[in-house]
Amino acid sequence: MINMRKSHPLMKIVNNAFIDLPAPSNISSWWNFGSLLGICLLLQILTGLFLAMHYTSDTSTAFSSVTHICRDVNYGWIIRYMHANGASMFFICLYMHVGRGLYYGSYTFLETWNIGVILLLTVMATAFMGYVLPWGQMSFWGATVITNLLSAIPYIGTDLVEWIWGGFSVDKATLTRFFAFHFILPFIITALVLVHLLFLHETGSNNPTGIPSDADKIPFHPYYTIKDILGVLALFLALMLLVLFSPDLLGDPDNYTPANPLNTPPHIKPEWYFLFAYAILRSIPNKLGGVLALIASILILLLMPLLHTSKQRSMMFRPISQCLFWLLAADLLTLTWIGGQPVEHPYIVIGQLASISYFSIILVLMPVAGMIENKLLKW
């Protein structure tokens, strides 16, 4: 009798994606982040659903409804902090996943990579809108500052901002629509994830060497299912350590003060996972220039396949490119640190240098390194 998992129309899809999928035999733990992102998304949807049952998206009650969740709802505090810190874990996994793609040349799978960049932008938009919902000081002022950036668009900017706000400032209408978008976007993300996987399974996974692995494949189950479970356990350990011991470590104390349009916090800054982009935004004195640099800092990922000059796909055997990659990683950490600092000397100059370095490494140094390494191959 034919195996049901191979014949049933629904089970066949699951089987071909998670059970009998031919996978390279040598993929390292850097390939765990895809499944971890799936788990993070599931966790965020579940915790978010339970939070939405008790949250009210009205300016007069939003802050107190979050307080009510933490104080009065059964295990509401753990649901709330798992959702807030789950977002941080989500972004850690996202950045690791993108970094893996850059290092091992996975961006040569064009469709998979482009959908991935769209996913990154969608997740960033979702996280930004989620940060506005508790309606604390940083929620309100973060929403005001970031949405206001759109006013830098020539001619239509001001009208566009007022259209997004639903009035002349961030108010009731803004909060309500942000809640609606924050609720629906994770489901759109889930659909995009399926498209991402669909394109990935057209080509099969990359591997650390960057060499085609068709001659050496193993079934996904049990080898990589057990490996993914280990990754999930490590993720949950890290998440629960954060949630149970220092749930507010990555948050901003200002967000425990209810939103007040008449009182501006001394340092307006987004969540830690946006600080690198925020630092790039602030490093340019011109408003429109800053906004363009901010957008470019993410969309530059779309250029990666065009900037690949090396004859080798992976950086595994390319020491010069490896040095530049880790320099880029250090540069992003520097930008993250600068984004959280006040706009004063010496932080301004450090931020500008780090921003120039970011674009220089990606647009100039890495392609040049690839060409140099091609020359070295002939020696």
From Swiss-Prot:
It holds the Pfam family Cytochrom_B_C. Binds 2 heme b groups non-covalently. GO terms for cellular component: mitochondrial inner membrane; respiratory chain complex III. It comes from the Eukaryota. Component of the ubiquinol-cytochrome c reductase complex (complex III or cytochrome b-c1 complex) that is part of the mitochondrial respiratory chain. The b-c1 complex mediates electron transfer from ubiquinol to cytochrome c. Contributes to the generation of a proton gradient across the mitochondrial membrane that is then used for ATP synthesis. Heme 1 (or BL or b562) is low-potential and absorbs at about 562 nm, and heme 2 (or BH or b566) is high-potential and absorbs at about 566 nm. Belongs to the cytochrome b family. This is Cytochrome b. It comes from Tragulus javanicus (Lesser Malay chevrotain). The gene is MT-CYB.
